């Protein structure tokens, strides 16, 4: 059997619907419900609900997000296979069976999401409106659609290559690479990080085209006040974790048309920049391993930004340093940067993969000195790898997910 891992925060109407949908088809399945200090009566509802196969965990402290709660639930679960399942999802018939028939050790299987027309269409999902909220959910129509689709030869036993929630895998394989990176707490982009690590670890990634969930979308952490309106806390989390992802991987997230991650090379790149100011330093710094610049406010930058990132900026930002020893060094004049040239820098790993050669070369305003080009991304598979940890500051025990600054800024914006 399989364990369902469901994090929640102030999402009780959706949680009730999600658990009810699972119980409709899987009375004995273990459900691990992880409550991120909700104040909506979730704990009271659980205490009044008799379900011998429901395990409940409540975080009584500050919000940690699903990044942390997923891993707590996975470690708690009793079965060797688990499924990440969002609180705003509804389980369809044969959900488990049509995942497990494709799952083997060192594999990750995603189901197919059916969603209302709130986001752009995609080849990895089905856009069909069975309701916007639990109260208007068309359950019988959804179940009929699932069963009819499962009998359709274009879906039955078919898999494609993509990964997204909900997904399932062996607990042992998840723990083998260290689980989610908790420094993406509370959310988002923790999924893209671990998906890339799954692929680099050699795990077989598939999507089952006849395992279905209905997904209301974004109700757990993004649209907490109004559908299709990102709340302010989510926006702050996005800004924090976008920079964290870029500093960690040296590039931004990219997926193909079926939502299979396109992993770019991670090179040891240093920027040597003249005519740099504080604003340009902030824009450029995340996109390289080190930056040497003539910005007179470079120390102020480190002081201002360090509280918001666990990456050690004293190892990343230097003033007119002759000690830059990166594998690849790029010199340029920041006063000549345009949006097009900045975009070129953000795509540099992919460009170097296609056309980089050892030695010195020039392109537009950029001068390259390429000593070597080892790809380092495979060193990021496990959270505790030396390459990653050596680039971080010592994380305080009083701020283990390094979110104090995030919550301070959020409080000041209220």
Please state what every model-predicted region is.
Residues 2-14, 18, 25-26, 34, ...:
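A conserved hydrophobic helix/loop-capping motif in glycosyltransferases and polysaccharide synthases
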Residues 20-29, 283-289:
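Short, acidic, metal-binding catalytic loop of nucleotide-sugar glycosyltransferases
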Residues 35-44, 90, 296-300:
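A conserved acidic beta->alpha catalytic loop
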Residues 68, 139, 145-172:
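A recurrent flexible, glycine/aromatic-enriched loop bordering the glycosyltransferase active site
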């Amino acid at each position: 059997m399989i364990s369902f891992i469901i994090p929640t925060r102030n999402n009780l109407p959706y949680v009730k619907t999600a658990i009810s949908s699972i119980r409709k088809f899987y009375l004995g399945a273990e459900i691990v419900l992880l409550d991120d200090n909700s104040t909506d009566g979730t704990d009271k509802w659980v205490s009044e609900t008799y379900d011998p196969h429901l395990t409940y965990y409540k975080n009584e402290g500050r919000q940690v997000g699903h990044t942390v709660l997923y891993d707590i639930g996975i470690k708690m679960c009793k079965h060797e296979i688990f499924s990440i399942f969002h609180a705003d999802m509804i389980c369809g018939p044969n959900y488990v069976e049509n995942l497990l028939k494709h799952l083997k050790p060192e594999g990750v299987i995603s189901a197919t999401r059916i969603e209302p027309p709130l986001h752009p269409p995609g080849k990895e999902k089905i856009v069909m409106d069975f309701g916007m909220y639990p109260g208007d959910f068309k359950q019988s129509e959804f179940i009929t659609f699932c069963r009819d689709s499962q009998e359709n030869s274009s879906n039955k036993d078919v898999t494609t290559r993509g990964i997204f929630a909900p997904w399932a895998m062996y607990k042992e394989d998840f723990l083998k690479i260290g689980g989610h990176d908790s420094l993406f707490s509370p959310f988002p982009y923790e999924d893209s990080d671990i998906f890339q690590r799954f692929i680099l670890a050699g795990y077989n990634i598939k999507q089952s085209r006849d395992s279905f969930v209905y997904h209301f979308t974004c109700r757990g952490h993004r649209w907490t006040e109004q559908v299709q309106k990102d709340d302010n806390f989510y926006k702050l989390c996005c800004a924090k974790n976008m920079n964290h992802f870029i500093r960690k991987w040296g590039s931004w997230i990219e997926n193909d048309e079926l939502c299979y991650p396109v992993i770019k090379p991670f090179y040891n790149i240093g920027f040597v920049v003249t005519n740099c100011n504080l604003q340009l330093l902030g824009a450029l710094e995340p996109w390289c391993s080190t930056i040497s610049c003539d910005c007179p406010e470079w120390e102020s930058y480190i002081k201002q930004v360090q509280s918001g990132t666990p990456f050690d900026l004293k190892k990343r930002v230097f003033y007119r340093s002759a000690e830059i020893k990166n594998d690849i060094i790029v010199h340029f004049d920041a006063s000549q940067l345009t949006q097009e040239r900045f975009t070129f820098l953000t795509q540099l790993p992919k460009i170097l993969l296609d056309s980089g050669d050892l030695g010195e070369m020039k392109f537009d305003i950029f001068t390259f000195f390429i000593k070597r080009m080892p790809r380092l991304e495979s060193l990021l598979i496990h959270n505790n790898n030396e390459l990653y940890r050596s680039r971080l500051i010592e994380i305080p025990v009083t701020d283990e997910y390094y979110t104090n600054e995030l919550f301070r800024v959020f409080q000041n914006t209220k």
